[in-house]
Amino acid sequence: MNINELKNKILQLAIQGKLVPQDENDIPASVLLEEIRKEKEQLIKEKKIKKEKTLPEITEEEKPFKIPKGWEWVRLGEIGFYKKGPFGSTITKSMFVPKSDNTIKVYEQKNAIQKNWTLGDYYVTKEYFEAKLKGFEVFEGDIIVSCAGTIGETYIMPPGIERGVINQALMKMNIFTGINIDYFLMYFESILKSTAKESSKGSAIKNIPPFDIFKKMLFAVPPIVEQLRIVQKVDEIMAYLDELEKTILNDNII
């Protein structure tokens, strides 16, 4: 087993609840999910989000592995908001203009893949943004995801980003309070990305599955305190493995 295979194994153990011990004093994930449900209902009531189609109940046959006591299975659509970029005809090169005080940045796949918001120099006018693209604006804390070709690469938009929108090759995600972002992304990397690749359409160019499939994907939710313990332990082990890999490379060079 090489270092990369070992890292993947660590992630598999982590998301199955086999990497850190469970604590019976932790507030169970069912309580957390009830709070998320209430938060979602309030946002719908305030008309900040639209009520979506009810997702199907999770069957035993769907569950890919057994989870510990206190954990819960949910579907992606139950724990966050997801929005794909505009149709291709909404943003084309003919609409791009030089950067100025009257422009809005258009974020691209490379921003997610290379995890750098400063890349790229495509802009549209504020007038066009207000008329056609306002719903695709990204904010600090949003997760952007590459959706075509190199799919599933994620990037959390940091403080100080330039005001902008996602293009047609990106999706943005907002996860509810109570789901640790680092845990979510770790799960996304280990399970959801590979699932998305397997179920994506096309052979030459892979794409994130349609939303009706994507939102039905399963997500294992530990108690919030355990999420933090898992992330901490994974970070600790990954840092050690990175150092080990460097040592092996240096020994091979010598």
Where are these regions (language model features)?
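Short alpha-helix capping/helix-loop boundary micro-motifs
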Residues: 127-132
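Short, ligand-facing micro-motifs at secondary-structure edges
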Residues: 88-91, 112-124, 143-166, 181-186, ...
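Low-complexity, Lys/Gly-biased intrinsically disordered segments
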Residues: 58, 72-115, 133
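Non-catalytic DNA-recognition/assembly elements of restriction-modification systems
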Residues: 9, 13, 18, 61-89, ...
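Short, well-ordered loop/turn sites that connect or cap secondary structure elements
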Residues: 137-139
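Structural signal for hydrophobic
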Residues: 71, 154, 216-217, 227
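Extended, domain-scale alpha-helical bundle/helix-rich regions
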Residues: 2, 6-62
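A short glycine-rich beta-alpha junction/loop motif
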Residues: 147, 163-171, 202-221
